[in-house]
């Protein structure tokens, strides 16, 4: 039994009777549509690869307030540094989402839950292979991409399982598209630590999690 003193981690009951721990961050891919509505996001994403080493730092909240991996109702999005244009700002947001994802793993690790094992990415964001590679780099671990990554496919697996073992049915239906290995020479750890420091300095991120995130970087 793991207790979360901040109450930001919760569990869903799985159909197989187990519990699935998780959290819902207010930062995510929705910020791209919010900031660049009506734009060709694929085209921006392609141009953003040239700014992998940007010094622009972004905390990509979609709206006011954060709920995971820390609770901060007054938290607001920010972007620090001068950019060369939309493509660099887009790159900073992609990195910011990946940094928040890493902070989520750091918090779960701080609570004492295992975070090792195979990591599979799902959802619409997996259509961008470069962003998936970025996430592998920031997380410093391999990520698996599957052929069908949409939530509707998960519902199809549940329907197909019936009274069979869900894990067995999922293993039969899910097909791996690619496995992306992390590139350790990309230098994201320093920028991640910068973001942790900015969140802590604003009083949103607690000292204990900030120290743990730095120690794991």
Residue ranges, per PLM feature:
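Active-site core segments that coordinate phosphate-bearing ligands/cofactors
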Residues: 1-120, 127-151, 156-217
């Amino acid at each position: 039994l793991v207790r979360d003193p901040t109450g930001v981690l919760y569990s869903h009951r799985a159909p197989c009777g187990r519990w699935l721990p998780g959290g819902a961050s207010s930062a995510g891919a929705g910020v791209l549509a919010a900031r660049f509505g009506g734009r060709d996001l694929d085209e921006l994403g392609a141009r953003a690869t040239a700014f992998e080493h940007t010094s622009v730092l972004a905390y990509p909240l979609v709206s006011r307030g954060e709920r995971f991996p820390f609770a901060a109702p007054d938290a607001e999005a920010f972007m620090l540094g001068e950019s060369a244009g939309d493509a660099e700002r887009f790159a900073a947001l992609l990195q910011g989402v990946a940094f928040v994802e890493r902070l989520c793993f750091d918090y779960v690790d701080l609570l004492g839950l295992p975070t090792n094992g195979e990591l599979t990415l799902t959802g619409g964001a997996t259509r961008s292979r470069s962003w998936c590679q970025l996430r592998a780099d920031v997380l410093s671990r391999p990520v698996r991409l599957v052929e069908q990554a949409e939530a509707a496919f998960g519902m199809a697996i549940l329907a197909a399982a019936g009274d069979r073992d869900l894990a067995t049915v999922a293993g039969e239906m899910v097909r791996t598209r690619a496995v992306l290995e992390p590139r350790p020479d990309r230098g994201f750890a320093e920028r991640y630590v910068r973001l942790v420091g900015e969140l802590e300095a604003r009083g949103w991120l607690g000292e204990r999690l900030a120290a743990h995130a730095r120690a794991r970087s």
